[in-house]
Amino acid sequence: MDPGEPAPKPFQQPEKPGRVRRRKTRRERNEALAGSRQPLTYQHPPVASRDPHMVLRNSVAPTAAKLVVITQGRLSRDHRGLFNHEVKSLDVARLLSSESLELGTPALTTKSSPSPGRGQQPSLQSRGKENQVPGGSGPGPPSPPQLPDLEQLLGELQCQLILPRAFPRRNLVQEARDAIVGTLQACHGCVPDLTLVLRGCQPHLPGTDPGALKRQRMTPSWINSPEQAPGEGRQRRRQGTKELTFAVPPTSSTPTVHQVSLAPPKGPWPPPLSSLPSPSGAAWGPPTAFDLLKSIWLVATPPPPRPWGIGPPQLLPQPPSPLLPRSSALDWSPSPPAPLPSLSWMVAQSSPEAWSFPPMRLY
């Protein structure tokens, strides 16, 4: 060999470009999958080869209009689903019998009628009753396959539920009341008076007179005159005078002013809220922020004294308020007896910091 010649290379196949296989589409994959599962899904013989008696017998039952194939993600025909491309349930029987909704109630009644009869046979045999064949000889005529009796259905249902007192007559309302009363007696040892709860009153305290509370609960105090309840009126007047003497500066003449201010305003409007019968503080609950604001606002605003020519009218018995003192500023009538002082005077007297309250009128 010539040394200038290149050495012969061993035999090699020429390199071919890599073959890119085309991926099948979803339709092709579904068709291939449907072709493999077709004999498993559809096994009914054609209609022409069936027995005519069987065709008449099965004409009531719903039959599939055409082949239904459940593939990876869709059906081959329209169905009642959430989406057209999804199958939310794998219940093939429900999908195949979707025409039963269109047939109406006869298909449902004929389909559900033989089920109680089949369920009755084991229960009758277990109870040891008559185990005759429906068409056999018996003392009475052969019973046709009809719906069972209502009492029989109730008895079987009672046996299946294993509830001995499921169907006898029961007074459920009385049982509920007995259960509530038993729970109250077990927890608290007594049953509360429901009349007090319905009227929104608390039971009387041991230190108070039950007769006075009863009279106060039956009739509002603004209807009663001082002659009907003289002791209560005097006691409440004394307590109101004490509170007012504590709250108002000593410069003003307290007894005369507040005898005048306690009078109800004359007019067609109802009596003020302060004169209405108010239960104890426990009945109203703890004081709220609005009560605190009223106490801050109204304590430092004494009304100007009235002229001496006005005589004191008749006084009305009023229950003492647990939070607020008795003053004419608490009179929530449409026309207050005296105008309130200015906001600047109130801020200067009651608070070290400037409160920006809007001009407000209690009603």
Curated annotation (Swiss-Prot):
GO terms for cellular component: chromosome; nucleus. The keyword Nucleus applies. It comes from the Eukaryota. One of its GO terms (biological process) is meiotic cell cycle. Residues 250-259 have a biased composition (Polar residues). The keyword Nucleus applies. Residues 1-11, 265-274, 314-323 have a biased composition (Pro residues). Residues 112-126 have a biased composition (Low complexity). Residues 1-53, 104-149, 245-280, 308-332 are annotated as: Disordered. It is found in: Nucleus; Chromosome. Keywords: Chromosome, Meiosis, Nucleus. Promotes meiotic crossing over formation through its interaction with CNTD1 by participating in the crossover differentiation step of crossover-specific recombination intermediates. Interacts with CNTD1. This is Proline-rich protein 19. It comes from Bos taurus (Bovine). The lineage of its organism: Eukaryota, Metazoa, Chordata, Craniata, Vertebrata. The gene is PRR19.
